[in-house]
């Protein structure tokens, strides 16, 4: 699981930061999932090492332009590039109507299937490898945060040990990998736990934007390996944050701390914190780190490989 930040500015792009978008790369299944798609996201994809041909799912938090204005252009370009794979899009009410209007007035026709899912609190996607749940956040328009949960996996299977015990290869290996008990024709019994390394605990990622501090963000971030949380304002601008229902750096840190998360990335920075401004982003990092030390500032094209868990590190 690799996270790539494609846009880390709020409201409008700056010279060094595009508006909101985060990509999650799942190399074991050759897929990319996108979270928000602000204007210019397809340009950011082209500048990154990611392949838009692997795009399979897009999760939209809310209907503000800095989170959706790049969506139609990206989908149209995928079609022009010859994409044939279905893309599933998840988001709040109004998203499907927005895309339908864009298609109708621009006379855009897709050569591949698109499925739009209007989300409700709870699970929005699951398969044998991952699940995604959403919860309402506290913003000026309906907004949802997302939690990506990787399913637990058995530890590495010791094939050499199984061979040395005279266990024939085939379906019995699969049963042992799943932790089951098997009995051979000669009466010997073996337990899967004796042939597998430490269990790999599924990794968790929380994506919370746009929102002020709220209990739902804490629950989405509970025990997360990575929390990606908006930090539009510094603590000095807390009154403005309450007025506009955005988070300060300290609010984001309080979410991560209350949730028992392992790492926090701040993103969605107001352009007022541009280089050479009176208050810089380093100040936001200092504020957050005083509460939650494992905090980093996200920047465009930052890649982060989410480390695997085992029973000893969970």
UniProtKB/Swiss-Prot annotation:
Cite the active-site annotation. Answer: 66 (proton acceptor)
Q: Known HAMAP family for this protein?
A: RNase_Z_BN
Complex formation: Homodimer.
**Is rRNA processing tagged as a keyword?**
no
Hey, which family's this protein in? Belongs to the RNase Z family.
Q: Which domain of life is it from?
A: Bacteria
Which EC number(s) does UniProt give? 3.1.26.11
Annotated Zn(2+) 2 binding sites:
66-67, 210, 268
Which InterPro entries does the entry link to? Answer: Metallo-B-lactamas, RibonucZ/Hydroxyglut_hydro, RNase_Z/BN
> What's in the keyword line of the UniProt record?
Endonuclease, Hydrolase, Metal-binding, Nuclease, tRNA processing, Zinc
Source species, please?
Acaryochloris marina (strain MBIC 11017)
Cofactor: binding details: Binds 2 Zn(2+) ions.
GO: which molecular function terms?
3'-tRNA processing endoribonuclease activity; zinc ion binding
**Can the keyword Nuclease be found in this entry's annotation?**
yes
Q: What is this protein called?
A: Ribonuclease Z
| Pfam families named in the record | Lactamase_B_2 (PF12706)
Q: What does this protein do?
A: Zinc phosphodiesterase, which displays some tRNA 3'-processing endonuclease activity. Probably involved in tRNA maturation, by removing a 3'-trailer from precursor tRNA.
Which residues are recorded as binding Zn(2+) 1? 62, 64, 139, 210
Q: Which SUPFAM superfamilies match?
A: Metallo-hydrolase/oxidoreductase (SSF56281)
Cofactor requirement: Zn(2+)
Enzyme kind, highest EC tier: hydrolase
CDD domains under this entry?
RNaseZ_ZiPD-like_MBL-fold
What reaction does this enzyme carry out catalytically?
Answer: Endonucleolytic cleavage of RNA, removing extra 3' nucleotides from tRNA precursor, generating 3' termini of tRNAs. A 3'-hydroxy group is left at the tRNA terminus and a 5'-phosphoryl group is left at the trailer molecule
Fetch the NCBIfam families from UniProt: PRK00055.1-3, RNase_Z
């Amino acid at each position: 699981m690799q996270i790539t930040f494609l846009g880390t500015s709020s409201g409008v792009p700056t010279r060094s930061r595009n508006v909101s978008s985060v990509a999650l790369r799942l190399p074991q299944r050759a897929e990319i999932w996108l979270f928000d798609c602000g204007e210019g996201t397809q340009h950011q994809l082209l500048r990154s090492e990611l392949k838009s041909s692997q795009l399979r799912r897009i999760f939209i938090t809310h209907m503000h332009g800095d989170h959706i204005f790049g969506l139609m252009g990206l989908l149209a370009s995928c079609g022009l590039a010859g994409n044939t794979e279905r893309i599933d899009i998840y988001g709040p009410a109004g998203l499907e109507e927005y895309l339908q209007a864009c298609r109708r007035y621009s006379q855009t026709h897709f050569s591949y299937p698109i499925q739009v899912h209007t989300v409700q609190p709870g699970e929005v996607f699951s398969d044998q490898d991952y699940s995604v749940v959403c919860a309402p956040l506290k913003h000026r328009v309906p907004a949802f945060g997302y939690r990506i949960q990787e399913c637990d996996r058995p530890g590495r299977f010791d094939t050499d040990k199984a061979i040395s015990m005279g266990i024939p290869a085939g379906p019995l290996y699969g049963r042992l990998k799943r932790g089951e008990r098997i009995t051979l024709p000669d009466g010997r019994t073996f337990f899967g736990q004796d042939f597998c390394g430490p269990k790999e605990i599924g990794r968790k990622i929380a994506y919370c934007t746009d929102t002020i501090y709220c209990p739902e963000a804490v629950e989405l971030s509970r025990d997360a390996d990575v929390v990606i949380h908006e930090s539009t304002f510094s603590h000095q601008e807390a009154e403005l944050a309450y007025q506009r229902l955005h988070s300060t750096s300290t609010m984001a840190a309080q979410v991560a701390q209350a949730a028992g998360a392992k790492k926090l990335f701040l993103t969605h920075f107001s352009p007022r914190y541009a280089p050479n401004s009176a208050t810089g982003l380093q100040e936001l990092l200092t504020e957050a780190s005083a509460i939650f030390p494992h905090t980093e500032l996200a920047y465009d094209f930052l890649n982060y490989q989410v480390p695997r868990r085992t029973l000893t590190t969970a």
